[in-house]
Amino acid sequence: MAKRDYYETLGCDRGADDTVLKASYRKLAMKWHPDRSQGNGEAEVMFKEVNEAYEVLKDPQKRAAYDRFGHAAFENGGGGGPGFGNDFASSFADIFDDLFGGAMNRGRGGGQQRGRGADLRYNMEITLEEAFSGKTAQIKIPTSVSCETCSGTGAKPGTQPKACRMCGGAGKIRHAQGFFTLERTCPNCQGRGSVIEDPCSDCGGAGRVTRERNLSVQIPAGVEDGTRIRLGGEGEAGVRGGAAGDLYIFLSIEPHTFFQREGADLYCRVPISMVTAALGGTVEVPTIDGDKSKVKIPEGTQSQKRFRLSGKGMPIMRARNHGDMYVQVVVETPQKLTKRQKELLAEFEKDSSGETHPESTGFFAKVKEFFQGAAGEGA
């Protein structure tokens, strides 16, 4: 009996692109899948036809050959069409992978291929003082580690993985189809060439188990909020003896009650009395290293004046110098004055001149000029 046209089988025209072909294939494969139509002989036949058609049309080379020669391109003496013979199991595996996310292959004793372990992330919060001095932190992380019972092989102690019968240990399956020789990854062993018939009882054949590990992490001085520290090989254990992933420590710095940080510089606000601002003096301010520094306040200091303490900021990573510390003074206005204090301030105000309050005098002079000018324009 003549075979149906592959495009007709999938319900697509000859100009259909890969997206259209795949969408049609998925729809029909779901419709005719044997698990959904048990006992329906027609469904099994249709499922095989859909699979065969898609196996050819999804491959650019095979599709080109089919478009030119038709079914004759795949005749090979034995009459087996594409997707059958040794490659038939592979075709079914592809369908299950496409429809069910690879669950079929995961249940086949082959397990996963050898591969690198996943990277891990660990969030750590430190204080500004710890960022200044650096620290050694002890952390605990739950992670997959290589199974000690089977040394990461996944096989029961005393046994070894055996060569895959489907591919003969090659990890690939070759199949001649007309003018072409096709090569596929073996669906039974997922390309490893071996399968585990007696899995390790501790790891179930995975080669890895979950454990909590204690690690020592060195935090260098001068780290900033958002700094990322990489610990090579401290991530998830590799699959079946593969290389371990990395561990990334992401740092965040707690807000400080006194200091604000901008890069390597520190900023703080210090209140001073009106008398100190007027007469001058010295104030002591705490520094991030736990010490204190004296700041000289000159006579007539205005509120919000900023003073710089060189080298009193944060250490600069990979350098020997430090940032600076900036002290902004805030002049406090006294509250709840006694009668005597009010009298003294009133007397001070009467005795004040333009030189005592240069900014205020200049301000009111400008206001006076403005109103006088406005009155002259209106006359």
Swiss-Prot record:
Residues 5-70 form the J domain. It comes from the Bacteria. Transmembrane segments: none annotated. Zn(2+) 1 binds at C147, C150, C200, C203. Binds 2 Zn(2+) ions per monomer. Signal peptide: none annotated. The keyword Metal-binding applies. Pfam families: DnaJ, DnaJ_C, DnaJ_CXXCXGXG. Zn(2+) 2 binds at C164, C167, C186, C189. One of its GO terms (cellular component) is cytoplasm. The keyword 4Fe-4S does not apply. CXXCXGXG motif repeats lie at residues 147-154, 164-171, 186-193, 200-207. Participates actively in the response to hyperosmotic and heat shock by preventing the aggregation of stress-denatured proteins and by disaggregating proteins, also in an autonomous, DnaK-independent fashion. Unfolded proteins bind initially to DnaJ; upon interaction with the DnaJ-bound protein, DnaK hydrolyzes its bound ATP, resulting in the formation of a stable complex. GrpE releases ADP from DnaK; ATP binding to DnaK triggers the release of the substrate protein, thus completing the reaction cycle. The J domain is necessary and sufficient to stimulate DnaK ATPase activity. Zinc center 1 plays an important role in the autonomous, DnaK-independent chaperone activity of DnaJ. Zinc center 2 is essential for interaction with DnaK and for DnaJ activity. Belongs to the DnaJ family. This is Chaperone protein DnaJ. The lineage of its organism: Bacteria, Pseudomonadati, Pseudomonadota, Alphaproteobacteria, Hyphomicrobiales.
